[in-house]
């Protein structure tokens, strides 16, 4: 029996969260086409042939001077120090530059490369990309094609990961899908609904805080604050006669209800907190990086 932690690293939009959901065959990680959708480390658990693999989905690696984005990158880098193996995820359409940047961070643990989105290309393109990575073969343990959509090569990827883990009893109850609290997952579903219902830039000025939860046998009651930075943005979140906020709430309720397996009463509020993205203490609280 083996058990260990795998940190999923890659640039924003490489498909890391989608890959986690495909391995779990459940929706746990926030998925969005927008960059930096993943803001907290999400730990998802996969049992593969009696071995326990704990995946840590991290914020994407990218270059940015913004305080918030710097903290996201620091969070991702720190996760590389706290794992047994790194899974570097890259789209088959990406150049090797992101991988070279990753190597420049001097990772101290073994890593595997997953070339994602191979269902969107042909064999010739895939083989060409594999040959481009071949010159780095001394650095990685294995490189495998992967399709989060079709779950192709799923067993092969998990087999390679297990090879890098140590013999160890389970760290968590094997019935768990994630060790993140349900409250954190609810928050991510609300944030995902914001991403899906608003324009490209506006969601980056927002965050979600769960204020209250009450769980009964047949009903889950949630109250949450959407934090934004200006009154004009607040108006955009609410929309004409509250239409936008209602749409966000409807989408989030559906996602949360599917996870909770019960009816959900969700109350959303919009609060203005100016310059929240530069408030380091507030950001550390959001990212669970408090000491």
From Swiss-Prot:
Cysteine disulfide partners in this protein: none
GO terms of molecular function: GTP binding; GTPase activity; ribosomal small subunit binding; small ribosomal subunit rRNA binding
G5, as annotated region: 146-148
Topology of this chain in the membrane: Peripheral membrane protein
Residue numbers spanned by region G1: 10-17
Short name of one Pfam family: KH_2
UniProt domain Era-type G: residue ranges: 2-167
Location (main, coarse): cytoplasm
Region feature G3, mapped onto this chain: 57-60
Keywords assigned by UniProt, alphabetized: Cell inner membrane, Cell membrane, Cytoplasm, GTP-binding, Membrane, Nucleotide-binding, Ribosome biogenesis, RNA-binding, rRNA-binding
Segments of this protein annotated with the region G4: 116-119
Domain of life: Bacteria
Positions annotated to bind GTP: 10-17, 57-61, 116-119
KH type-2 domain ranges (all copies): 186-274
Region G2, residue ranges: 36-40
CDD domains listed in its UniProt record: Era, KH-II_Era
Subcellular location per the Swiss-Prot or TrEMBL entry: Cytoplasm; Cell inner membrane
GO cellular component term, pick one: cytosol
An example Gene Ontology biological process: ribosomal small subunit assembly
Subunit composition and interactions: Monomer.
HAMAP family in the cross-refs: GTPase_Era
Biological role stated in the UniProt entry: An essential GTPase that binds both GDP and GTP, with rapid nucleotide exchange. Plays a role in 16S rRNA processing and 30S ribosomal subunit biogenesis and possibly also in cell cycle regulation and energy metabolism.
Family, as annotated: Belongs to the TRAFAC class TrmE-Era-EngA-EngB-Septin-like GTPase superfamily. Era GTPase family.
Protein name (record): GTPase Era
Gene name per UniProt: era
């Amino acid at each position: 029996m083996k058990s260990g932690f795998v940190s999923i690293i890659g640039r924003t939009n490489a498909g890391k969260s989608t890959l986690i959901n495909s391995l779990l065959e459940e929706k746990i990680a926030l998925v969005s086409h927008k960059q930096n959708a993943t803001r907290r480390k999400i730990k998802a658990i996969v049992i593969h042939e009696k071995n326990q693999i704990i995946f840590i989905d991290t914020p994407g690696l990218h270059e940015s001077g913004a305080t918030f984005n710097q903290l996201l990158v620091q969070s991702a880098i720190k996760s590389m120090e706290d794992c047994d193996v790194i899974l570097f995820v890259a789209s088959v359409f990406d150049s090797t530059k992101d991988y070279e940047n990753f190597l420049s961070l001097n990772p101290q643990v073994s890593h595997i490369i997953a070339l994602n989105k191979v269902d969107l290309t042909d064999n010739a393109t895939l083989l060409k990309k594999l040959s481009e990575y071949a010159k780095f073969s001394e650095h990685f343990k294995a490189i495998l094609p992967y399709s989060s959509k079709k779950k192709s090569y799923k067993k092969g990827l998990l087999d390679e990961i297990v090879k890098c883990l140590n013999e160890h009893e389970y760290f968590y109850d094997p019935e768990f899908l994630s060790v993140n609290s349900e409250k954190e997952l609810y928050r991510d579903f609300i944030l995902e609904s914001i991403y899906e219902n608003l324009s490209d830039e506006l969601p980056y000025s927002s965050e979600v805080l769960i204020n209250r939860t009450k769980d009964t046998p047949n009903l889950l009651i949630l109250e949450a604050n959407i934090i934004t930075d200006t009154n004009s943005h607040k108006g955009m979140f609410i929309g004409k006669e509250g239409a936008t906020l209602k749409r966000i709430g409807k989408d989030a309720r559906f996602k949360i209800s599917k996870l909770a397996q019960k009816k959900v009463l969700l109350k959303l509020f919009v609060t203005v907190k100016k310059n929240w993205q530069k408030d380091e203490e507030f950001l550390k609280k959001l990212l669970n990086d408090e000491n």
